[in-house]
């Protein structure tokens, strides 16, 4: 069944002016986003490269803000030219921000300070300080000293916008200790906080004496995920671990005596002691073996995706039920392609329970449904497929004339990700406009040209195609963001040169304007 006809923009605006909406929360917002989606996808709308900038340090983007110099300078991406929001004072290398997350105010919560109702940047510095910075002014609102006994390096959401996990670098031990044969049992530490107001859950150590020869660990949605070099992945409940093995409840800003030393929790030089030390193997929730520890959970009901733990199985994905490990019908997904870069698969971020499988020349959106007359088993089927625009031939014939004049014909196979054919590089989802964005690249002569396509998330129909004016080198690292009426392309070139290209939605008047090239 095809898409139904929807009201045009004028009709939507008229209904909005008259207040013709139900009383459901969010109806006006959804209507506004529907109007914006119609404007984005209409034929006369263009996306123009309004400004470009270059930097010697990494460039990051988050919700309309572009960050330079390790998050020290923030520029608005909304204006038609670079508009600086703030610039923090210069700092030493040890004080630079290494990782950051954007926190946005929850709806309906009563917060202690008026500044808490505005967005904040939660930042981790090189010298183990956790900062909460105003996203509009750059002012430091809160600061917590983590610990002197390890180097914290990574920030991630355990529960989005509610709980953060701060992960340390892996403890390799000193060269002297390794030469002396002294084994380092603690692999890494995980510090867990609830945000706004900041409160400490605890710091957990990952100890090889308990978990064995573990190679990595992380925290996601309250689950401790432990990985091994053999490909084994094990899942544990973090809440159960905290309740069972927490040595002492610690509160930020309160006095604490630990190991014969007294100090204030979260202040230098005392920091936060490691107060969750596992002394016995916690209850195991789930384990599975997968190539390169690749493991994902999603779908309705819960399913997981793994690759069988054999190198020759790379590119083969098994979709299984979490409750009993049973393979879904048609649950072995393998894309028929020959390419240098492997295809990838993941659960659709729109919470529909669907699965996106991306190869060099096609994007498959798969759906998980119950088998008729057997509600306990599920099957995988295609919802829709997006195909690259390329000529339908895999074999090329080359004619060679020998010295004697004999014509020799040789046949060879083209790779599916051959740069001279249109190849998919990035697939993302714009949740507010409900659009799939797909970056496709083709090598033309010496340079690559890319375009960003918007597809209907429900049916896969192509709604809009935006050419990117800058050349695209497939050997460089690229990120492309589509955020409402903005497209942003960040490119990392050799010798740590970063470029940022900003495109904004405009109404096509037929007049060409000069693109602004700025150094931010």
UniProtKB/Swiss-Prot annotation:
Transmembrane domains' residue ranges: 186-206, 222-242
Subcellular location: Membrane; Nucleus, Nucleolus
Top-rank taxon, per record: Eukaryota
Swiss-Prot/TrEMBL keywords: Deafness, Diabetes mellitus, Hypotrichosis, Intellectual disability, Membrane, Nucleus, Transmembrane, Transmembrane helix, Ubl conjugation pathway
Signal sequence annotation: none
InterPro entries xref list: DCAF17 (IPR031620)
A GO cellular-component term linked to this record: Cul4-RING E3 ubiquitin ligase complex
Pathway given in the UniProt record: Protein modification; protein ubiquitination
Pfam families: DCAF17
Tissue and organ expression note: Ubiquitously expressed.
Biological process annotations from GO: acrosome assembly; cell morphogenesis; protein ubiquitination
Its membrane topology: Multi-pass membrane protein
Annotated disorder: Woodhouse-Sakati syndrome: A rare autosomal recessive disorder characterized by hypogonadism, alopecia, diabetes mellitus, intellectual disability, and extrapyramidal syndrome.
Oligomer status and interactors: Interacts with DDB1, CUL4A and CUL4B.
Protein task: May function as a substrate receptor for CUL4-DDB1 E3 ubiquitin-protein ligase complex.
Name of protein: DDB1- and CUL4-associated factor 17
Species of provenance: Homo sapiens (Human)
Taxonomic lineage of the native organism: Eukaryota, Metazoa, Chordata, Craniata, Vertebrata
Gene this protein is translated from: DCAF17
